[in-house]
Amino acid sequence: MSRIGKKIVLLPTNISTQFDGQTITVNGPKGTLLRTLPEGITLEINDGTILVQTSGNSKRANQLHGLSRTLISNMIEGVSTGFSKKLQIQGVGYRSQIDNNNLILSVGYSHVVTIQPPQNIEIKVENNTSITVLGIDKEVVGQVASSIRSIRPPEPYKGKGIRYQGEVVRTKAGKAGKGK
């Protein structure tokens, strides 16, 4: 059995869950999330707790036991408090802005890059160089933040580009040059 999978998931009072077949639905103040669990994973929902169990001795179910518990825990956290990912833009003339819910990036290309966020994802821009991605689904928030970063990842010489807040970029020394 998985050490993580054995842990009980606590349900806050403002969260309601339903489990039908292999599908779990979590409702909360921020929204609703739906996920299909793999075969061999069962849930036992009691007053205020969820216990994730494997049915039978399936090797695949044992492998996905801890993952399923963590995904359910993330769903509960998402609909109650939400998730956020912060990005920083570094570079002379690099900036961002919001226009009709679309993120517009000016990051050194000959054109501006426009990103339309998916459903249930909100993007905020503070002082043109700080981007915050907000949402209830941790996986989608991470994917959107990753796609924004991939537009101009930090380069290793001066560190210009888009990076996660707190990310440390290892810089290289430039060319040694010719001795004169």
Swiss-Prot record:
GO molecular function term, any single one: rRNA binding
PROSITE patterns to which the protein is assigned, alphabetical: RIBOSOMAL_L6_1
Keyword annotations of the record: Chloroplast, Plastid, Ribonucleoprotein, Ribosomal protein, RNA-binding, rRNA-binding
Keyword Chloroplast: yes
Pfam families from the UniProt entry: Ribosomal_L6
A single BP term in Gene Ontology: cytoplasmic translation
Membrane-spanning intervals of the chain: none
Entry's Gene Ontology cellular component terms: chloroplast; cytosolic large ribosomal subunit
Main localization of the protein described in the UniProt heading: plastid
Reported function: Binds 23S rRNA.
Family per record: Belongs to the universal ribosomal protein uL6 family.
Assembly information from the UniProt record: Part of the 50S ribosomal subunit.
NCBIfam families with a match to the protein in the record: L6_bact (TIGR03654)
Name under which the protein is recorded: Large ribosomal subunit protein uL6c
Organism of derivation: Porphyra purpurea
